[in-house]
Amino acid sequence: MALDQSFEDAALLGELYGEGAFCFKSKKPEPITVSVPSDDTDDSNFDCNICLDSVQEPVVTLCGHLFCWPCIHKWLDVQSFSTSDEYQRHRQCPVCKSKVSHSTLVPLYGRGRCTTQEEGKNSVPKRPVGPVYRLEMPNSPYASTDLRLSQRVHFNSPQEGYYPVSGVMSSNSLSYSAVLDPVMVMVGEMVATRLFGTRVMDRFAYPDTYNLAGTSGPRMRRRIMQADKSLGRIFFFFMCCVVLCLLLF
């Protein structure tokens, strides 16, 4: 019964709307067009704050405002100012009134339009390279002076046991006598003097140590005498061992 009712309904619709009421024609889907902005209109969000046009050779200030380089150059041109008030006004950002100069402009590359040859004939120089922050290098005269003073104070303190480095040696390297213990250096000199009869240590590696105020005191002399006695005993014991070895073997 339900099937017969559906056929009757279809026949009534065919009489009302004609034979083509249930004929579905195959149509191709219409292509969806998406508007993609071109390169010429891509700079619509990057407008100059002076000419309100797409930026040409864009530069940005430290306060974050974008300008064309020709526009901001004309704004900062000090030769066309007549009064000091006008000069001070044009030394400020046109938007936020913060200080602006040619040295604080940062160029932007890869955006905006470039100047053509006809536009380049105007008296507009090239864009600035941006602010340059110079760091004080260690080889500057002030830094080298501070380094020499700190080294002089460090090596001339007698209570720490340091000794001055010879002027021939570089300030970046440590001398041989500053690394070793001065007592060990003196012991080595005494051993060399007793064994070979001459002083082997170079004076440039251990310069004028005995002429210092810290080494000419009674405490240092007493230490030298004790080291000399100890070396004498060690040398005597060593010679006895050598003689015994020669006699036994």
UniProtKB/Swiss-Prot annotation:
Swiss-Prot/TrEMBL catalytic activity: S-ubiquitinyl-[E2 ubiquitin-conjugating enzyme]-L-cysteine + [acceptor protein]-L-lysine = [E2 ubiquitin-conjugating enzyme]-L-cysteine + N(6)-ubiquitinyl-[acceptor protein]-L-lysine
Membrane topology, from the record: Single-pass type IV membrane protein
Known outcome of mutating C63S: Loss of ubiquitin ligase activity
Annotated GO CC locations: endoplasmic reticulum; endoplasmic reticulum membrane; membrane
GO biological process: protein exit from endoplasmic reticulum; protein ubiquitination; ubiquitin-dependent protein catabolic process
InterPro entries associated with the record: RNF5/RNF185-like (IPR045103), Znf_C3HC4_RING-type (IPR018957), Znf_RING (IPR001841), Znf_RING/FYVE/PHD (IPR013083), Znf_RING_CS (IPR017907)
ZnF start-end (RING-type): 48-97
EC class of the enzyme, as a word: transferase
Transmembrane parts of this sequence: 231-248
Record key words, sorted: Endoplasmic reticulum, Membrane, Metal-binding, Transferase, Transmembrane, Transmembrane helix, Ubl conjugation pathway, Zinc, Zinc-finger
Effect of loss of the gene: No visible phenotype and no effect on drought stress response, probably due to the redundancy with RMA2 and RMA3.
Pathway annotation from the record: Protein modification; protein ubiquitination
CDD domains given in the database record: RING-HC_AtRMA-like
Gene3D superfamilies named among the record's database cross-references: Zinc/RING finger domain, C3HC4 (zinc finger)
Compartment(s) where it occurs, according to its Swiss-Prot or TrEMBL record: Endoplasmic reticulum membrane
Free-text comment about domains: The RING-type zinc finger domain is required for E3 ligase activity.
Entry function: E3 ubiquitin-protein ligase that promotes the ubiquitination and proteasomal degradation of aquaporin PIP2-1. Forms a ubiquitin ligase complex in cooperation with the E2 enzymes UCB8/UCB10.
Protein name per its UniProtKB record: E3 ubiquitin-protein ligase RMA1
Higher taxonomy: Eukaryota, Viridiplantae, Streptophyta, Embryophyta, Tracheophyta
